[in-house]
């Protein structure tokens, strides 16, 4: 008794909470010290103790135990405020959609997590023995996430697709949910229940398949005699923890030496002591035996398996290690699927944690330990590289808050902070994110409107002539409000253009263009509201040609129309001068003509491959809706491969004499489309067949123009009714009809089977229609074929160059299909559709080794010589450095202005003006500003800015009168001077009346100067050439300007007369985009709605409302500049990386994919080339036979290791520890099959037969002839159906097929596995039934000795291969001959 008491006094009492991990450690230590029997006795006592205590405690849960956290209300308010600001920023266009989504997730997730962290301290302070508090960390019947949903907030939920729903559930289950929150909650809960059911069944089925593959793997021998092993080293990126887990329980494959001292011998099992010795001495690499290296075919030896997972000794003979391995991998999946159910679909992701201030006070920290930076959302912060403390000083107390390494401090030193304010952000652990996937986020148009963007866009490299654009830098994309007219019943019967309207001339027939019977009074009476004020001057409509509209209207960028197709150009080395001719007779003949549209940006800068002009050919114009088809056209299988038609886009060719025309085709499949309101009562059924002139809608007299098949599709707010014309064919089951959406069949094709079939004369489009699941028929639709002439002889554009200089600047013609392949095009209110546009593309030879970006300046020049007015386009190649330097020039009595600036001035509206300019070819000159003879010019102003440069003579009465005479449709007001500006986005043409706006500007001061010989300063950007203006010539600018010079986007400088006081006003340019909430004036009010400046009055602006979208580089824009979009159309596609949740519900399918050997990763494009390079190098080093052998061995070994690592990655992300040897047994079975190839026909195996790898190697050694086979990866299902036991296969899947095949082949089942013995009722060969199999005969012993001799031979071979390569060839032959003679002696 005394001895017992003495022992008890020496015992240590541990007062700690014990969890599952601690229980595992305790059990393993008990087994090590006391053995299995005594340990089971102790565990029974622990179980009985727990049962008694739980019964005595009898914890129950009542509704009063659910105590809500008091800080929840203001935490939710804080998160709502941040979400509101985020929504505002997104609405203003400051934050794009992906950024908004990520920040919203972070805000609510951080709030929810902080509430969860506050939960336990709150319970400990108020009610430590609360049942909810006790259950929350028990791990048996509840977890923190469940209790958090009960008393905290449910937070963010996942939708059925697994995506996060943006609207969080702010209530908890104790408070009760609102209707909206309940519906969102049902999404997640349903997803949780379904996931649990599906994933549990998936995990169970996975376990069954795994056990099926390896049920016959037993430990049958002590040692298989292998000399192979795999190397384990911490240098291969393996952490020390994983290194230790990999080594413990294994057996060494080779001796381990440190210098001359051996610290580990071959075939010794590795314990924790030996691992510590390896780490201390840094012994690496360490070669260990694994199931991969075992020489057995259908079993495994004791030493290759290692220690038993239950107790510390080597595994016993007769252990069913295969079943243990299958269950070890499948069981964690079965258990962990319940995690989804526990959280009920609540979104759980990893974001940065926040540190909050414990009380009000002033924060202080050492500024020398932090460095200024920005958060990932762009907010200023301080980064700390070491752990340190920040101090918060309040009146009575000081708080020290620990800030971990690499955290971001979000407040400044000495700043006053409030209690629970976020002061720091701890970086999220990157190790939690194992899987990243690229996700596409589509942005859809919220309203109907016209697209504009504020930067250069370029085509994607894959589709250079499509409507998909990429933006090179962050910019805004605008949707200007307004849509196209769908009904022409209320439109006036002639084309009356209002200010800045874009009217489609093709929507009216020529006879409706004008009506001479209408008087001005009738027009004014009809359209009084359109012009706003009654006192506005009525326009003169008496001349009919003023009303005739342009032939086409599609304006893409700021452009100026030239309605003449005849262009001649003289070409110089770095410059074009293209004279433009205007045919006045055409205007008098009242014929609307189609012409070339010149397209030059506002700043006049063109880059390489810019489009400078385009021409809409009327041949490619359609009046009906339809579908375009081009690219690689799908043709039915009855056509040979050579008949595939590929649209190759435009051919690049130099502008020499090009006589050959290359013709490409594209196809247009016409169809009739009606867009009807969503509530329209339609009178035809879906998939019905109607005739011509059938009434479609009950209350509207809409009739079909063609007969055919009707397809009705319901959109968001409308019905889309399509009518397909064509023939309908019903086919039997014999004919195979492709299930694709449609197939084009070329002419000259007929069916080979049917005798009476005729060959096709034209292209047809075959479409499969399936009205019900069982029935289908085929619709054969007519196709309109268009041919694109891809070459135009550009030599006709230029005259012969006498100097024969090198052609640097070049023009080429590109045919541009305006609609993407397979796109459904719908015409609106009888408008015509332009399918192909011919574009004139400017290009030049880029200088090599030049970091300077080359640009081209394009400008319009107007020259009058001897009363002859000529217009030119001047295109000049200029090298411009990336950063401009500013210089000022002071010259007495003159102001310098560059030739380029002058060209840009006159580019504004050259065809409207009748001004005279004489340009003299001098490199540098002055701009004289003498008074006119009648001294009417009162002030002169020069402005220069990034986007505009204007010269304005104010109050020049002669100019005003002349303009009034020339254009009676332009009313001029005489306040202080007109600003008749052509809107940058809307361009005028001569055939319609001039699109002018009336921008009246008031000046605070007017400068009356008698002498103009004063100094002017001009901000100039070199290098440019200067032009000289004669002092006596008349200076004219169609865009007289005011002194409005400053805005919030561009900084423009104004250089006034030196006597005047310099004041700055905001510049308001027409077409300028303004974001909401921006101050336009210093003391004015904010802009209440985003939009584009439409009209500028004296005291007001008219803004066309627009919606801005922020677009980041790499985002894809769908559609052309200026294209009209409808509500719900796809505008932008963002591509961003999203961290996949590490939940096992996402991991299990990945494990299954790996084990079933399905492709999960994208394959490298140059994989084949790399493999060929590897083969060539290894053959060169080792010779042909050894190169192939070692290459094949390495491939199999590496693929096995890779598969094990991928599966471990999934399980480790969940904190599940599975020993590698279990995975290795499974992977060994997946990779142990080879496919007999047809290269060498052997008598033993059939070509295409699956055999074991070791069996194939042994058969090759025994037979005189070689067997050709290919290593192959078989999934676990296929491996289960390719075993040596047909009883096992038949009991798994495809029973009848397997048994019939086995009977035909006469297979014999040797009943070596567990399953076949269970099926037949025999004793299974494991455990006590194992000894029945093991009784060695003499013959068996002889085989064993032979194998050992062979092993020694292989060992010598490997030494020679690695150390004495030169001796190898001679020694190998000699050794093999000796070995053969020894065998012959034994046989004889």
UniProtKB/Swiss-Prot annotation:
A GO biological process of this protein is: DNA-templated transcription
**Chain sites annotated for binding Zn(2+):** 224, 294, 301, 304
- Mention any Pfam family matching this sequence: RNA_pol_Rpb1_5
Q: What is its main location?
A: plastid
What are its GO cellular component terms? Answer: chloroplast; DNA-directed RNA polymerase complex; mitochondrion
Provide the protein's localization: Plastid, Chloroplast
Gene3D superfamilies tied to this protein: 1.10.132.30, 1.10.150.390, 1.10.1790.20, RNA polymerase Rpb1, domain 3
What are the names of the required cofactors? Zn(2+)
Broadest EC class?
transferase
Mind telling me which SUPFAM superfamilies this protein's record contains?
Answer: beta and beta-prime subunits of DNA dependent RNA-polymerase
Q: Which reaction does it catalyse?
A: RNA(n) + a ribonucleoside 5'-triphosphate = RNA(n+1) + diphosphate
Q: How does it assemble?
A: In plastids the minimal PEP RNA polymerase catalytic core is composed of four subunits: alpha, beta, beta', and beta''. When a (nuclear-encoded) sigma factor is associated with the core the holoenzyme is formed, which can initiate transcription.
Q: Which family does it belong to?
A: Belongs to the RNA polymerase beta' chain family. RpoC2 subfamily.
**Name the UniProt record assigns to this protein:** DNA-directed RNA polymerase subunit beta''
Species name: Phalaenopsis aphrodite subsp. formosana (Moth orchid)
């Amino acid at each position: 008794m005394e001895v017992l008491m003495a022992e008890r006094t020496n015992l240590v009492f541990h007062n700690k909470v014990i969890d599952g991990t601690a229980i595992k450690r305790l059990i393993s230590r008990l087994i090590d010290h006391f053995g299995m029997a005594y340990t089971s006795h102790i565990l029974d006592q622990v179980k009985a103790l727990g049962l008694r205590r739980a019964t005595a405690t009898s914890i129950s849960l009542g509704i009063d135990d659910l105590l809500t956290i008091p800080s929840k209300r203001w935490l939710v308010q804080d998160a709502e405020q941040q979400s509101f600001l985020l929504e505002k920023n997104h609405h203003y266009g400051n934050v794009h959609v992906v950024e908004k989504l990520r920040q919203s997730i972070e805000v609510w997730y951080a709030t929810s997590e902080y509430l969860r962290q506050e939960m336990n301290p709150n319970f400990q302070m108020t009610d430590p023995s609360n049942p909810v508090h006790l259950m929350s960390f028990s791990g048996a019947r509840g977890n923190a996430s469940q209790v958090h949903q009960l008393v905290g907030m449910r937070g963010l939920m996942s939708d059925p697709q697994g995506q996060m729903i943006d609207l969080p559930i702010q209530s908890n289950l104790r408070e009760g949910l609102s209707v909206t929150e309940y519906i969102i909650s049902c999404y997640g809960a349903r997803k949780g229940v379904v996931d649990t059911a599906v994933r549990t069944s998936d995990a169970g089925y996975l376990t069954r398949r795994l056990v099926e593959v390896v049920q016959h793997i037993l430990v049958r021998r002590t040692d298989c005699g292998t000399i192979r092993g795999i190397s384990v080293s911490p240098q291969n990126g393996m952490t020390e923890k994983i290194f230790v887990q990999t080594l413990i329980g294994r057996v060494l494959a080779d001796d381990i030496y440190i210098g001359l001292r051996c610290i580990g011998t071959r075939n010794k099992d590795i314990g924790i002591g030996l691992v510590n010795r390896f780490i201390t001495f840094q012994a690496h690499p360490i070669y260990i035996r694994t199931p991969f290296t075992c020489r057995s075919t259908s079993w495994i030896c004791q030493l290759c398996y290692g220690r038993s997972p239950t107790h510390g000794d080597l595994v016993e003979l007769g252990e069913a290690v295969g079943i243990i391995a299958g269950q070890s991998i499948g069981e964690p999946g079965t258990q962990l699927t319940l995690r989804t159910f526990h959280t009920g679909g609540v979104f759980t992701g990893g974001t940065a944690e926040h540190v909050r201030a414990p009380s009000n006070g002033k924060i202080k920290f050492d500024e020398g330990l932090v460095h200024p930076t920005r958060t990932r959302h762009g907010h200023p912060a301080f980064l700390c590289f070491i752990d340190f403390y920040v101090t918060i000083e309040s009146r009575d107390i000081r708080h020290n808050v620990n800030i971990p390494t690499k955290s971001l401090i979000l407040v400044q030193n000495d700043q006053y902070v409030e209690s629970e304010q976020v002061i720091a952000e701890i970086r999220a652990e990157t190790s939690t994110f194992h899987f990243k996937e690229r996700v596409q986020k589509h942005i859809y148009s919220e309203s109907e409107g016209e697209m504009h963007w504020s930067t250069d866009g370029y085509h994607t490299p894959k589709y250079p002539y499509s409507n998909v654009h990429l933006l090179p830098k962050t910019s805004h994309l605008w949707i200007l409000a307004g849509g196209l007219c769908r009904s022409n019943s209320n439109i006036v019967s002639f084309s009356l253009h209002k200010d800045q309207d874009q009217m489609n001339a093709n929507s009216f027939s020529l006879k409706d263009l004008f009506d001479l019977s209408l008087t001005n009074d009738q027009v004014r009476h009809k359209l009084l509201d359109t012009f706003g004020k009654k006192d506005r001057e009525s326009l003169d409509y008496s001349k009919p040609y003023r009303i005739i509209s342009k032939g086409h209207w599609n304006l893409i960028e700021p452009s100026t129309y030239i309605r003449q197709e005849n262009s001649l150009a003289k070409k110089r080395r770095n410059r074009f001068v293209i004279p433009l001719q205007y045919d006045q007779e055409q205007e008098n003949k009242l014929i609307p003509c189609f012409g070339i549209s010149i397209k030059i940006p506002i700043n006049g800068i063109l880059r390489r491959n810019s489009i400078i002009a385009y021409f809409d050919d009327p041949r490619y114009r359609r009046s009906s809706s339809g579908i375009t088809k081009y690219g690689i056209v799908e043709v039915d299988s009855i056509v040979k491969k050579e008949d595939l038609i590929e649209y190759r886009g435009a051919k690049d060719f130099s502008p020499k004499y090009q006589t050959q025309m290359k013709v490409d085709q594209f196809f247009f499949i016409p169809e009739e489309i009606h867009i009807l309101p969503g509530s329209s009562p339609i009178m035809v059924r879906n998939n019905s067949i109607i005739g011509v002139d059938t009434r479609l809608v009950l209350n509207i007299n809409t009739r079909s123009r063609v007969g055919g098949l009707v397809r009705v599709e319901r959109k968001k707010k409308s019905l889309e009714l399509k009518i397909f014309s064509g023939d309908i064919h019903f086919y039997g089951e014999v004919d195979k009809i492709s299930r694709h959406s449609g197939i084009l069949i070329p002419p000259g094709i007929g069916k080979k089977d049917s005798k009476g079939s005729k060959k096709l004369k034209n292209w047809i489009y075959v479409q499969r229609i399936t009205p019900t699941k069982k029935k289908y028929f085929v619709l054969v639709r007519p196709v309109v074929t268009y041919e694109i002439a891809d070459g135009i002889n550009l030599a006709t554009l230029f005259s012969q160059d006498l100097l024969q200089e090198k052609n640097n600047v070049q023009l080429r013609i590109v045919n541009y299909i305006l609609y993407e392949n397979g796109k459904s095009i719908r015409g609106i209110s009888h408008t015509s559709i332009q399918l192909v546009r011919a574009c004139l593309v400017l290009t030049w030879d880029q200088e090599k080794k030049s970091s300077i970006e080359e640009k081209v300046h394009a400008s319009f020049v107007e020259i009058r010589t001897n009363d002859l007015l000529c217009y030119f386009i001047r295109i000049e190649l200029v090298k411009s450095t990336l950063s401009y330097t500013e210089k000022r020039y002071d010259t007495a009595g003159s102001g310098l202005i560059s030739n380029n600036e002058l060209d840009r001035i006159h580019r504004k509206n050259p065809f409207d003006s009748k001004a005279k300019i004489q340009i003299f070819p001098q490199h540098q000159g002055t701009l004289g500003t003498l008074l006119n003879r009648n001294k009417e010019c009162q002030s002169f102003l020069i402005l220069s800015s990034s986007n505009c440069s204007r010269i304005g003579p104010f109050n020049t009465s002669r100019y005003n009168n002349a303009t009034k005479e020339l254009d009676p449709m332009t009313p001029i007001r005489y306040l202080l001077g007109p600003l008749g500006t052509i809107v940058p986005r809307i361009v005028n043409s001569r055939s319609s009346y001039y699109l002018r706006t009336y921008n009246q500007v008031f000046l605070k001061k007017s400068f009356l100067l008698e002498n103009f010989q004063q100094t002017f300063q001009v901000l100039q950007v070199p290098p440019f050439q200067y032009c000289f203006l004669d002092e006596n010539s008349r200076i004219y600018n169609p865009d007289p300007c005011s002194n409005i010079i400053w805005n919030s986007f561009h900084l423009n400088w104004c250089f006034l007369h030196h006597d005047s006081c310099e004041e700055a006003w905001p510049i308001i340019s027409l077409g300028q985009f303004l974001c909401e909430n921006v101050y336009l004036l210093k003391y004015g009010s904010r802009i209440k709605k985003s939009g584009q400046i439409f009209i500028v009055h004296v005291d007001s602006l008219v803004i066309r409302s627009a919606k801005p979208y922020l677009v980041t580089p790499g985002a894809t824009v769908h559609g052309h500049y200026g294209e009209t979009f409808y509500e719900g159309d796809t505008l932008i596609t963002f591509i961003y990386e999203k961290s996949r949740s590490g939940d096992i519900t996402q991991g299990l399918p990945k494990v299954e994919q790996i084990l079933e050997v399905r492709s999960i990763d994208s394959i490298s494009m140059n994989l084949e080339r790399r493999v060929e390079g590897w083969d060539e190098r290894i053959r060169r080093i080792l010779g042909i036979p050894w190169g192939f052998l070692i290459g094949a061995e390495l491939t199999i070994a590496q693929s096995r290791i890779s598969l094990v690592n991928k599966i471990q990655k999934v399980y480790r992300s969940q904190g599940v520890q599975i020993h590698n040897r279990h995975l290795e047994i499974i992977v060994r079975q997946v990779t142990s099959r080879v496919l007999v190839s047809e290269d060498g026909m052997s008598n033993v195996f059939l070509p295409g037969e699956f055999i074991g790898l070791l069996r194939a190697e042994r058969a090759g050694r025994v037979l005189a002839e070689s067997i050709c086979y290919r290593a192959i990866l078989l999934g676990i299902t296929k491996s289960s159906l390719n075993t040596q036991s047909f009883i096992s296969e038949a009991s798994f899947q495809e029973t009848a097929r397997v048994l019939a095949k086995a009977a035909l082949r006469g297979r014999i089942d040797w009943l070596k596995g567990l399953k076949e013995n269970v099926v037949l009722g025999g004793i299974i060969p494991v455990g006590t039934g194992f000894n029945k199999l093991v009784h060695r005969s003499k013959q068996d012993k002889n085989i064993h000795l032979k194998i050992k001799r062979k092993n020694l031979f292989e060992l010598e071979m490997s030494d020679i291969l690695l150390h004495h390569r030169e001796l190898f060839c001679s020694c190998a032959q000699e050794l093999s001959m000796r070995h053969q003679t020894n065998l012959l002696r034994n046989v004889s």
